[in-house]
């Protein structure tokens, strides 16, 4: 049975790879920094902004809060009134991207922020997922799934071989025997990278009727 799950996992990875290989075409360059006195300057700031398609003022507000110093944009450059290392900048830029840009489900960078009342939603143009924006620090302790554990998921699509699929906590879970729109409790049998195989252990009462 273990071999069967291994084969199914490899098949799932191949299917997912072929269907999503062109989704995430965006490549974000590392900040190019120079120092002038006590200031750190990101020379390619606007290039980064153009790629992630976010309001530069939104990014500046985030970095100002994180670094606790004055930050201004000058043309295509960003001037930070503090000495920073490349590692410090990368850490905060990655935190911004993982919170406000990268899809929480499929990982695509092709997203936009939309308002729904007072709630800001991260909407993915690649997979269609919509989620309230939350800090990556808030989700860090609950961002993985584990073999042997049980999760309740809603099946969002069915593959050509009849297996149900869903995105959950950044993983694509393949669930043999599940139908689209069905809510099921699954036990994770195998996990590899961001792909998992789940076994149905309970269907919702509504589905049983």
Swiss-Prot record:
Keywords linked to the UniProt accession: Initiation factor, Protein biosynthesis
Chain ranges of the TRAM domain: 144-202
GO molecular function, one term: sequence-specific DNA binding
Any one GO biological process: regulation of DNA-templated transcription
Tagged with keyword Protein biosynthesis: yes
One Pfam family named in its UniProt record: eIF-5_eIF-2B
InterPro entries according to UniProt: IF2/IF5, NA-bd_OB-fold, TIF2_bsu_arc, TRAM_dom, Transl_init_fac_IF2/IF5_dom, Transl_init_fac_IF2/IF5_N, Transl_init_fac_IF2/IF5_Zn-bd, Znf_GATA
SUPFAM superfamilies hit by this protein: Nucleic acid-binding proteins, Translation initiation factor 2 beta, aIF2beta, N-terminal domain, Zinc-binding domain of translation initiation factor 2 beta
Assembly and oligomerization: Heterotrimer composed of an alpha, a beta and a gamma chain.
Protein's job: eIF-2 functions in the early steps of protein synthesis by forming a ternary complex with GTP and initiator tRNA.
Record-linked HAMAP family: eIF_2_beta
Family: Belongs to the eIF-2-beta/eIF-5 family.
PANTHER family cross-referenced by the UniProt entry: EUKARYOTIC TRANSLATION INITIATION FACTOR, EUKARYOTIC TRANSLATION INITIATION FACTOR 2 SUBUNIT 2
Protein name, per record: Translation initiation factor 2 subunit beta
């Amino acid at each position: 049975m273990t071999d069967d799950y291994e084969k199914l996992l490899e098949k799932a990875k191949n299917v997912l790879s072929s269907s999503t290989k062109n989704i995430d075409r965006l490549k974000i360059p590392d900040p190019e920094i120079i120092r002038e006195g006590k200031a750190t300057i990101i020379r390619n700031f606007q290039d980064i902004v153009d790629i992630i398609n976010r309001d530069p003022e939104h990014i500046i507000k985030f970095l100002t809060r994180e670094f606790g110093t004055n930050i201004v944009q000058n043309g295509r450059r960003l001037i930070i009134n503090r000495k920073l290392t490349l590692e410090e900048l990368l850490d905060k830029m990655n935190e911004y991207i993982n919170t406000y840009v990268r899809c929480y489900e499929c990982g695509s960078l092709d997203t936009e922020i939309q308002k729904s009342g007072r709630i800001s939603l991260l909407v993915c143009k690649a997979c269609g997922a919509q989620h309230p924006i939350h800090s990556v620090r808030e989700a860090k302790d609950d961002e993985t799934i584990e073999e042997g554990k049980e999760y309740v998921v809603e099946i969002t699509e069915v593959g050509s071989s009849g297996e149900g699929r869903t995105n959950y906590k950044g993983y694509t879970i393949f669930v043999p025997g599940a139908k689209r729109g069905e809510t099921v409790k699954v036990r994770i049998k195998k996990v590899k990278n961001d792909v998992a195989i789940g076994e149905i252990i309970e269907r919702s009462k509504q589905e049983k009727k």
